[in-house]
């Protein structure tokens, strides 16, 4: 039975782990790092780069480099956060069936497709590490993600070729990784501040149970926003001095973004750092340089209101759980942004407890997801996760009112029903508008979907009985059904969130992903073949220059001819790997005499001995053959 991959699909970085040897174990990517930048880039040559290679070229290719895609997962273009994303992101955020998507070189990609490319990279690197195929995963999401965002995350996994066994909340996952389920019963706060999202969750843990009591947060608050405060400050200072707005220059903005992120990280350990960007722009007077010192105190003043927003959320969630700060036994810090000293100090001062920072905040969520994978596979016994729905769910009723069917904080999975009736005499159909949120009026809440139950027999208003059922599975994904109790007619909608993707579109994307996988594999093989050919040419030409006097002219001519053949082949436009391999093989074969000449010069006695032993060389048994490479 294959291993389940635990994935923390982050805004800034992603991480993966498996359950091995009775514990979660982080898997490094092919670059040897425990985290992979959640960045995807499209090059002018048609290549798709993911992770570190994509991040490295972002400065020179800002409009085709996608980062922070998690910020627009499941987001509608009509939402304020979409408008904010359009202002902040250097790539084009466009409308696709009402949902946010990105446009690269006249092609539109959904956030699910971009996220799938990150997941594919993680999947491939995990398979290389484990030496076996990985087809199942547990993926984490912020506790405050709504239905649309959860569904979009699951769709991304499907497109990447993963069977997503479970979507679980990041704080719950962190609690598992910290082993808090093994302690005596106590109430804890998980404070999770990542690159783009913030969650705070109160859990009751102990006796192998992790139960969510209350959760809150902001799906659009994190380290990216801290970076943006530095960017805004530096750009404003630069404009005041030079009269040039750097935010209108996408390449300058990308350089400033990288510098701001580095400055933020450095200020976690230093009291002051410098943003130094030579030749950031130019005008009629010549090139301009951005050189600014920023102190930790200045940085803290820039982000103080953002930190206070997180403190207010802690207060709200503790009260929502019916608790006081004195009831909290432990505070667990999760997410890279919790490394900021001011964040740690404010949380510690507010709750009045020392912070638990015993696990790497960048890795803890993926570790917990791997443990949950072990639970689902039966490798981990007696652990029970009791997650809750973060927002109330209901339908629109007469007068545009939101009538709640499942209240916020209800433990999932859950199934609840309510009976409704018609608003008019002889009403033949009812429209069910599914809503998520805490406001009293339907228009102030998020619409998750709409469907119609028709064929209701003629009857006075208030007589027909329409049973509406809300069913939330363990992933937090919702199915809503409506049934006319008189006729037994029913209609249901599996809420696809506002992802804007139909099942057929997801299926097409899965096939496209497989298709690109083959293309990518061919492209990679071609690059490797070219590299091998270049290396062989270099070594052969170098050796020929050194040892040509020890070769007969006919042998030298053969080698030179094979070198030229390979060089000409590499210049061809529509080159195949087979053509390269053929010419490489030819050059390798004619170069044998050159190798003999080299060996003879270096070790003449051994060469003579070798000549004498040639007759016996073919008599070695297969068992004696050692296949190895020497560096």
Swiss-Prot record:
Region described as Disordered: 600-631
Induction: By stress conditions e.g. heat shock.
Residues with Phosphothreonine modification: 197
Molecular-function GO terms, alphabetical: ATP binding; ATP-dependent protein folding chaperone; unfolded protein binding
The keyword Secreted appears for this protein: no
InterPro entries: ATPase_NBD, Chaperone_DnaK, Heat_shock_70_CS, HSP70_C_sf, HSP70_peptide-bd_sf, Hsp_70_fam
Chaperone keyword on record: yes
Keywords recorded for this protein, A-Z: ATP-binding, Chaperone, Nucleotide-binding, Phosphoprotein, Stress response
Stored CDD domains: ASKHA_NBD_HSP70_DnaK-like
Source superkingdom: Bacteria
HAMAP family found in the cross-reference section: DnaK
Role summary: Acts as a chaperone.
Family statement: Belongs to the heat shock protein 70 family.
Annotated protein name in UniProt: Chaperone protein DnaK
